[in-house]
């Protein structure tokens, strides 16, 4: 039996890197009977059948699980946003960051295309937030050294809306990837996703990146009762203030004596971040247990 990590799952096959080789594996039927599937990022026990093939026999305990995109054991979610066309909506960033926080992941926001827009509204917002933010350019290489340092020694999942240059950034980090790069439509102001499946790549030194299909894949199960119950905790800027609110159970939406609202008014919490919180709160407030899939 060998131990390895799943780097790719495609058409019923799991590609497991054991350190010595990559095995093309099938999963035992017991996984299907137990209602679970091995995921990219999983550490697994595999039986080597020879000829580069094997069977996944067991999945080791996971530190976290994302069902969409299907990946496990993510240390850090790297959100790629665009400082130029197509400019990323702050709500999309905040929504994904909230899900990552719920899953126990670190979050890193990277604003690509900084060579095209130096007066960046997104940077103004997030440089005053609790989310770490980098300005980078896949075109010029600006900020990529800082990005490499920020992802070192971690399993990082990269995501971003179409057209932000995710594949271009990954190609700069690991040139041998040769990931396809799409173009941004001038008419629509958005790109077309070129990533079709989740795949893990090793950058060396214990650093790994997972390329995911993008923001749209993060919807559904993650937006559930658990996020509803812990929503304020997923906005780290709120942490210094939530225990100072006048009322226990304050929702930080409209209550008198809410210290979070006062911090927003005072400029200590970015108003844009709080607007995203309110939008998420409105989406989740009426969700009931029987509605959870």
Regions found by a protein language model. Name each.
Residues 12-16:
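Short aromatic-glycine-enriched beta-strand elements
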């Amino acid at each position: 039996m060998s131990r390895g990590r799943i780097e790719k799952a495609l058409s019923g096959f799991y590609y497991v890197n054991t350190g010595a080789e990559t095995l093309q594996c099938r999963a035992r039927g017991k996984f299907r009977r137990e209602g679970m599937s091995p995921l990219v990022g999983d550490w697994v026990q595999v039986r080597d059948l020879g000829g580069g093939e094997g069977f996944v026999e067991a999945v080791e305990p996971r530190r976290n699980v994302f069902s969409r995109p299907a990946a496990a054991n993510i240390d850090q979610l790297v959100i790629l946003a665009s400082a130029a066309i197509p400019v990323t909506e702050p709500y999309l960033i905040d929504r994904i960051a909230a899900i990552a926080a719920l899953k126990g992941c670190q979050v890193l926001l990277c604003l690509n295309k900084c060579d095209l827009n130096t007066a960046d509204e997104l940077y103004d917002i997030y440089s005053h937030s609790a989310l770490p933010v980098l300005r980078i350019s896949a075109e010029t290489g600006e900020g990529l050294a800082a990005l490499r340092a920020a992802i070192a020694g971690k399993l990082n999942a990269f995501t971003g809306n179409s057209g932000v240059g995710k594949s271009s950034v990954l190609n700069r980090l690991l040139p041998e990837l040769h990931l396809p790069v799409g173009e941004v439509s001038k008419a629509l102001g958005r790109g077309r996703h070129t990533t079709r499946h989740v795949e893990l790549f090793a950058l060396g030194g214990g650093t790994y990146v997972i390329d995911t299909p993008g923001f749209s894949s993060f919807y559904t199960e993650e937006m559930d009762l658990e996020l509803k119950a812990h929503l304020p905790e997923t906005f780290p800027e709120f942490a210094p203030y939530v225990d100072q609110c006048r009322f226990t159970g304050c929702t930080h939406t409209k209550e008198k004596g809410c210290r979070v609202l006062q911090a927003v008014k005072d400029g200590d919490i970015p108003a844009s971040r709080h607007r995203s919180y309110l939008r998420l709160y409105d989406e989740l407030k009426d969700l009931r247990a029987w509605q959870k899939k």
